[in-house]
Design a protein with these regions (language model features):
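N-terminal cap/lid segment of alpha/beta-hydrolase-fold proteins
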Residues: 18-51, 448-454
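N-terminal export leaders
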Residues: 1-2
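Short beta-strand/loop motif that positions the catalytic acidic residue
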Residues: 260, 266-268
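Accessory cap/linker subdomain of secreted extracellular hydrolases
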Residues: 78, 141-259
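Active-site-adjacent alpha-helix of alpha/beta-hydrolase-fold enzymes
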Residues: 276-298
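Alpha/beta-hydrolase fold nucleophile elbow
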Residues: 118-131
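Cap/lid segment of the alpha/beta-hydrolase catalytic domain
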Residues: 47-115, 158, 162-164, 169-171, ...
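C-terminal, loop-rich substrate-recognition/catalytic regions characterized by aromatic stacking residues
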Residues: 197-223, 310, 315-589
Length: 589
């Protein structure tokens, strides 16, 4: 429903029946005044009851105005909750200036404002994914008295690690997200009488330019598209802090795990790029939350999903069908969770489910577990080996259960002008793409095991210990774990990247000595997959994953300042002296 300009200017609450659900009444643009006087606006979905009810709050920078009239908000309201959806500071209908992820104080103030609304019974839960997961966690870390429970989907534990993975910049999201925010900021500045409640994003032409021009532009800190420096200065703030420092500390959720006092249900997918953050938040809060009840009532579910909220019809990613069991009604789980904590059942005790539920790919079935990572998983090593030419899947790269004889090195050339493509369009979604086209590239080293005699169950974080040298003073190394079927189909499972200068940690960059073999420990991410009998375990090694990550220009210059790039000659070592190895968390069967 669109509001007239006068209603927008005055912030007048407007009431309407929901066309999608006549039992739900929608109240538009209720005003909440923050501690500094800035007014934020929210829409409220009222259930069909005159009674005071518990409330569920979502705070979003993407417009509180739903794109789908039959949205989650209506379902939650129909389940007996007052649903409050607020535009975050400086976005859409809310006043003020947006500072991305600076949501702790506003989150606290909004929770307490919601609890005091005359139609709310004083109990508040929070829900939402991605940025809206951040708004929950940062608010909860401030301990608002009336906050009872959380349902964060796809969350980060460290904003730095969300922006820089292994020191490499998440280019597709970092640039694409900020350009999307700039569109709203530009409209607010140039069209003050426009309908600010309507969601807005990049135009088709702007999306094309993002893919074909803007993400290729160098230097990174000279981007002028959409007057980005004026309308989304946060992009340049990120570029100015390529190492973890006090700028990032104020957004660090992991450092606040000991402050959490409420139960939380953490949801993510094996192909969500925020998977690692969600796993870390679950484990950290379960171990360190401030109360015993909060520690006991952290829950985790991980399915064969991407960055989007799963539904009962979510069973495919691309060409891979995970079967009927993969479909999952996350909204029903959310209703169950909040009914327990906000509907009176909490008095009966803890939430009645195992702490962890995982979808195990390969066998495509759900499994309940007691912890993450799994205590019974055993670190198992596969050694890299070759006869000196592991380039492409047709090469002679091998993964061996024991240190194997053979040539001590493989080499490839990394040219930033022709990077290895990410292969998927989503900035924060990966996919089980068939890798065979990429494995034909000479700049991709491919190491494969022999066909397995029995199933191999891998559940947990995967690590590559890589001995490598480079002709450059700084470069990147990438790793990807792949499940290869007997017919040759090569399904990507998880991947990682490390910028060489950050091999010693995210606070201490150190350039390479060209040509000197150096040990790199690459976090390849987590997975849950059974490699079936007859399948092969495969590892791909290269130096780029573009445009998900920026291209390392190989110069060793300060980050984001290079206007030109150089080619690097890369050498991967595998010998007794330099034992490159893939470390898998294998679960005994």
């Amino acid at each position: 429903m669109l509001l007239g300009a006068s209603a927008l200017a005055m912030g007048t609450p407007v009431r309407a029946q929901s066309a999608a659900n006549p039992q739900v009444r929608v109240e538009k643009n209720l005003e909440a005044r923050m501690r500094d006087g800035v007014v934020l606006r929210a829409d409220v979905y009222h259930p069909a009851t005159p009674q005071r009810m518990p409330a569920l709050l979502q705070r979003t920078p993407y417009s509180k105005n739903p794109q789908d009239a039959n949205s989650l908000y209506h379902r939650l309201a129909s389940a007996g909750f007052v649903v409050v959806v607020q535009d975050t500071r400086g976005r859409y209908m809310s006043d003020g200036v947006a500072v991305p992820h600076d949501e702790a104080a506003d989150g606290y103030d909004t929770v307490e404002w919601v609890a005091a609304l005359p139609f709310v019974d004083g109990r508040v839960g929070m829900f939402g994914g991605s940025y809206s997961a951040t708004t929950q966690l940062l608010a909860a870390s401030e301990r608002p008295p009336h906050l009872v429970a959380l349902f964060p989907s796809a969350s980060y534990a460290s904003r730095y690690d969300m922006v820089f993975q292994g020191g490499a910049f998440y280019l597709a999201d970092g640039l694409g997200w900020n350009l999307g925010q700039a569109v709203d900021a530009r409209r607010r500045a140039l069209e003050p009488r426009a309908d600010r409640d309507a969601a807005i994003g990049l135009s088709p032409d702007e999306r094309r330019q993002l893919q074909t021009t803007w993400m290729w532009a160098l230097p990174l800190d000279a981007v002028t598209a959409l007057d980005l420096r004026r309308y989304a200065p946060g992009y340049f703030d990120m570029l100015a802090h390529p190492s973890f420092d006090p700028f990032w500390e104020r957004f660090d959720v992991a450092a606040r795990h000991g402050r959490f006092e409420v139960p939380a249900y953490h949801l993510t997918g094996w192909y969500d790029a925020l998977l690692n953050g969600t796993l870390r938040n679950f484990a950290g809060m379960r171990a360190h939350a401030a109360t015993d009840r909060a520690r006991r009532n952290q829950r985790l579910i991980v399915g064969p999903w991407t960055h989007a909220r799963p539904t009962s019809n979510t069973r495919r990613i691309g060409d891979v069908d995970y079967g009927e069991e993969a479909g999952f009604d996350s909204e029903a789980l959310m209703v169950s969770w909040f009914r327990h904590w906000l509907g009176g059942a909490a008095a009966a005790g803890d939430y009645p489910s195992p702490p962890v539920r995982l979808f195990v790919m390969g066998e495509n079935r759900w499994r309940d577990e007691q912890e993450w990572p799994l205590a019974r998983a055993r670190s198992t090593t596969l050694h890299l080996a070759s006869d000196g030419s592991a380039n492409t899947a047709a090469g002679n790269g091998r993964l061996a259960w024991h240190l194997a004889a053979g040539a001590p090195t493989d080499t490839f050339t990394y040219d930033p002008h022709t990077p290895v493509p990410t292969g998927t369009a989503g900035a924060y979604s990966r996919a089980p793409t068939d890798q065979r086209d990429l494995e034909r590239r000479g700049d991709v080293l491919v190491y494969s095991s022999a066909p397995l005699d029995a199933p191999l169950e891998v559940i947990g974080p995967v690590t590559l210990v890589l001995w490598a040298s480079s002709s450059a003073r700084d470069t990147d190394f990438t790793a990807r774990l792949v499940d290869v079927a007997p017919d040759g189909a090569a399904r990507a499972l998880t991947d990682g990247i490390l910028r060489a200068r950050y091999r010693g940690g995210r606070t201490s960059p150190e350039l390479l000595r060209p040509g000197v073999p150096t040990e790199f420990t690459i976090d390849v991410g987590a997975t849950a997959n059974v490699f079936l009998a007859g399948h092969r375990v495969r590892l791909e090694v290269s130096s780029s994953n573009f445009p998900r990550f920026d291209r390392n220009p190989n110069t060793g210059a300060p980050f984001a300042t290079d206007s030109a790039v150089v080619t690097a000659r890369q050498t991967v070592w595998h010998s007794v002296a330099h034992p490159s190895r893939l470390v898998l968390p294998v679960v005994p069967r």
